[in-house]
Amino acid sequence: SVLSSMGCGRVVVIDYCTGVTASLAMRPWREWLRTYRQQQRGTHYLSAPGSQDITAEVCIDQLALGVGEADAIRSQAQWLQLWGIDELVDEGRRWWEEKASAPDLRAMTGRSRVREAEALCDPAGLGAFTVLEWVAGP
């Protein structure tokens, strides 16, 4: 497996996930098998072959069978918070507040950072991903 060949390190998977494969049978298939074209939801997966991306939710139970249980399973927001997104947002907010009356590039970057973090942590939008981590070594 990749983990045993690494020695030490971390494998991070970021994707749409569901815990148990059987739960997909209880949901409409268009929720867990999706198509995208030009950053928009696509049409039926067979209606325009080769013109859209097809993606399916990753079933965590299937990954566990192949590589073992993940060491950590978090929402995208939790993972970003773990790695300091709140501190980056606070810094951006300070930059904006310092120069809001006459914004420079740094202030605009700070303001943008706040809005981007909101989007990346929104579980109904760009933040709908799950983050799985496997750690190898000490």
Walk through the language-model features, giving the residues of each.
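Long, Lys/Arg- and hydrophobic-enriched amphipathic alpha-helices
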Residues: 1-138
